[in-house]
Amino acid sequence: TSFEAKADALFDMAKERKIPTFAIGDLGNEMGMGAIREHIEKYIPYAQKGADHSTCRCGCNGGICARTAADTVLTATVSDWGTYAVCAAIAFLKGDTDLMHTPEMEKEVVTTASRYGMIDMYGWLVLAIDGMDMSILMAIVSLMRSCVSNALGLVDTCKTWFDKTIELGYFG
């Protein structure tokens, strides 16, 4: 639609150059989610082409499912959360929680986006993402940061934990 950047052209260029592509989505309208089109059209309202009750509103009559197909797809209840999970995994692998954003940053981003007209999936101008209010959004970010921080604190312990368990006679 006219509201969105035409970033799918970049996606197509990456595929032409054999650069692996990756998509994160929740409803199938996210770039790259066309890779699982059959599943999306079966389970997601408005994804199918043609039928009046199930088409997108841009005028193409093609349904909301993205045209582009990624090589790898990650689905999440809230696509933002899938993105945060990928960032959390990278932060763990790099040993640096500063690679993740904070609950305060989440609040600022959502507030700023809302101030400039971002609507929720329900069409509401609210401080929420996919129906999840600010307290939930901030809690998810906080929980992911805590999980990574905790896991990083156990890296050395986990190198030998199973040895100690066997030494004590378990699983023997």
Question: What do the predicted segments below correspond to?
Answer:
Residues 15-21:
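A short helix->loop->beta-strand "cap" motif at the edges of active sites that frequently abuts
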Residues 42-106:
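A conserved mid-domain beta-alpha-beta active-site/ligand-binding segment of alpha/beta enzyme cores
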Residues 77-80, 96-172:
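C-terminal accessory domains and tails appended to enzymatic cores
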